[in-house]
Amino acid sequence: MIKGILLSLSASVLFGYLYYFSTLLQPLGGEDIFGFRIIFTLPFVIAAVFLFKQKQAVGQYFVRIKQQPLLIFGFLFNSAMMGIQIWLFLWAPNNGSALSVSFGYLLLPLTMVLVGRLVFKEHISRVKFLAVVIAAIGVFSNILLKGGLSWEALLVSFGYSTYFATRKILKINDLAGFCLEMSLLLPVCIYFAWQVDLQAVQQANENILLLLVLLGLISGVALNTYIVASSLLPINVLGLLGYAEPIMMLFVSFLIGEQLDSETIPLFICLMISMILFMSEGLVRLKRRYK
């Protein structure tokens, strides 16, 4: 298990570093970085399909699509949802929205709990219910003080929840399904990358070509590291370690100069308390399981 924990934490650190890495790719815009990231990351995802013996699962999806043609719309929807999230992740640090997106990732486990309860009738423990209530208080305070949550935080928390729920409903929540979803993004990403005048960009950032290759390399290594970790760890441990990424994102947000305004502090405190409650419950369950 130690190996899995180290791999999961390494993946979170790499994903957190990607949040910062996009600031090194200026003057490229969010769409440009998004296009290049998918182009350079997809080969790693395809390699993972072969490495983890998911080739047959990919073929089975094509059989399902042939039998159920409407399933292709599910893949297209999920592909679009995933693409929006990846774009937002890369766009935010260069546009003053790094903290807002980080808040969205902190809210995500709470919205996932609500989706699990409302859509899949999953049980909610008292601790998780308390965490949701505290987060709701933070959200309500933000509505009173600022008129509502930022669109970035809402897009992350509810967008990703919808994405994961749709994958579960359609039974495409595996590596093979992820590979097909990312592959469907390729035409759009090629278009975005094709529009970039790399010669002009190189005049402003002479290392841009090397940085773009590193973008794909870091993304691919982070993704495959996470996949390996997920195969070594129980799902509850993996979920608990998943909090490392939003913490890294918060750190990056402060590192690049973003600051909390006074109206947002109550939301921040409530989300941190909720996160601590989630993590505490997870640790208690792990202790009981391996006692």
From Swiss-Prot:
Instruction: List membrane-spanning regions.
Output: 5-23, 33-52, 69-91, 101-120, 127-144, 148-165, 172-194, 209-228, 235-257, 262-284
> What's one GO-annotated cellular component?
plasma membrane
What top-level branch of life does the organism fall under? Bacteria
Q: Which UniProt keywords apply?
A: Cell membrane, Membrane, Transmembrane, Transmembrane helix, Transport
Provide the protein's localization. Cell membrane
UniProt membrane topology term: Multi-pass membrane protein
Check the record and name the Pfam families matching this protein.
EamA
Q: Which InterPro entries match?
A: EamA_dom (IPR000620), RarD (IPR004626)
Name the family.
Belongs to the EamA transporter family.
- Name recorded for this polypeptide: Uncharacterized transporter PM1281
Organism (species): Pasteurella multocida (strain Pm70)
